[in-house]
Amino acid sequence: MRCPYCQHPDSDVIDTRKLHNGETIRRRRKCEACGRRFTTYERVETVSITVVKKNGEREPYEREKLMRGVRTACYRRPVPAQALESLANDIEAELMALDEPEVPSSLIGDMVMRRLRTIDDVAYIRFASVYRSFADIGKLREAVDELLEQGR
């Protein structure tokens, strides 16, 4: 693996650990030339999925785009990064199980909302307010009331 610091092409693996139920491998490496250490992650490359947006536009599925939206919803909330990684892994596993080359963005949004609801109520409402495009405060209040009602 090429060193990100000095660009030397070879490095030694110092430590290897499985993460996310063995779906990801974390490796600590040491550059043979400069001696600096760095971390790499390995994950099985999934089959490409095309996301069909509400306006009919198609774009390739991007894990980072999903993570960005979830991180934004969880901003300054006590949600561990591991929970967000697990959420993304679960959604990707569910998408792969569908075995469909194209999935509507609404399906992914529903998957995110279902999982966020169990992780953090505030993050759920934040995500829902953008995803559902609440037109006014009344619609937002309905969502909060629904959440409170289900929590009882």
From Swiss-Prot:
The role this protein plays is: Negatively regulates transcription of bacterial ribonucleotide reductase nrd genes and operons by binding to NrdR-boxes.
Question: Keyword set for this entry?
Answer: ATP-binding, DNA-binding, Metal-binding, Nucleotide-binding, Repressor, Transcription, Transcription regulation, Zinc, Zinc-finger
Q: Name the species this protein comes from.
A: Roseiflexus castenholzii (strain DSM 13941 / HLO8)
**A Gene Ontology biological process term:** negative regulation of DNA-templated transcription
Classification via Pfam families: ATP-cone (PF03477), Zn_ribbon_NrdR (PF22811)
Required co-factor?
A: Zn(2+)
Q: Upper taxonomic classification of the species?
A: Bacteria, Bacillati, Chloroflexota, Chloroflexia, Chloroflexales
Please state what the protein is called.
Transcriptional repressor NrdR
| The gene coding this protein | nrdR
- Taxonomically, which superkingdom? Bacteria
Tell me how the cofactor is bound: Binds 1 zinc ion.
